[in-house]
């Protein structure tokens, strides 16, 4: 378990970007506050989200963190400890009028009891809220105020969001009024019917995660107590089927599977891989945990050979890694200079300072899924990227240049791309590192895909 909560000198970026709306109308500053102990304001008595975001409590919190810590944060695990004598990052107290990201908690209640979880019904979490369900009018008020400037809404916090009888209405409201907002939710998949899952697929929501920890009922229910594996899988399948039927590229569908001692055998993990592929989910990932103490997987502890084998399939290791066979994106990138002959001897790329240079490349899709060249929601489209590095490999500019794929690149196929970039203004020796990037998600290298690096001589 992370010991960040023990830090007395720390930093944190959340108060500059994010707020969490609890189901009773109070606003807290982070998603790791199950019992609502760090309240910034209460929208039942305060007029606007902005009045909370720019208010004295939030402003003082930013001042304190800018000085190296705040008592307000208490045991929050989101704290990032500072090293001895390390100065805290300098950020202005003025964080703008509104946050750029918002979590919305519909309810703290849940329809199952996850073994020893901090939000299980037995913990009394619902008694820490002053209302059982989020008021719909309060919801629309908050979304109407913040929507124009939000980049993302996470439609969940503690509890199961879709227990709220108007949860699907809320999802549809957000996407109808603020289609630019990236809308994400996480669910156990048990609170709606198959028709509800299909409605969710049609809502325009950008990404949905189903948490299903097992490939059979007997192992699944060990952690998701009172859960129904068959129902969760049926709803997951209905969501994926409706996405296929409508022909859209959203929602992106994740199956997240926490590894425990009772569900981490190869046969069960392979069954999950096959099921995910058959259902048609976009991504299956394993989650590594260190609790409950008597349940977490010892087999996949970081540093073990088994962990290394699935490292690129782990939920928070890479946002592109995928346990479905062939679904992790991999590419081969061949790079020439001004002609294909340059590739024969690995000749350096040469340019004139401040002048454009055209670089010929060949990109081959080594995975089993196509690389999309376009996306309706501006994410997960794939482009070729060039990262500028010093001669010793030190990164100078990760986003130095991009080039579009001419069209979606099918599995096993190759495309020629000419990238035009401007040479640095200062002559010298550099290096260019080429990789593909899933825009808004991650570089392919983070999921284990090979990159290509070329010397870059600028005269």
Segment roles from a protein language model:
Residues 1-47, 51, 105, 129, ...:
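Radical SAM enzyme [4Fe-4S]-AdoMet core and its adjacent flexible, acidic
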Residues 2-15, 50-103:
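N-terminal [4Fe-4S]-dependent radical SAM core
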Residues 37-40, 80-207, 222, 234:
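Conserved alpha-helical substructure of the radical SAM core
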Residues 340-341, 381-383, 389-405, 448:
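Short beta-strand and strand-turn-strand segments in soluble, beta-rich domains
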Residues 363-367:
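Asparagine-centered strand-capping/turn motif at beta-strand->loop junctions
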Residues 368-395, 435-437:
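Short acidic, flexible loop segments centered on an aromatic residue
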Residues 371-375, 440-451:
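Beta-sandwich strand segments
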Residues 420-428:
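Short, surface-exposed loop/turn segments at beta-strand-coil junctions that are enriched for proline
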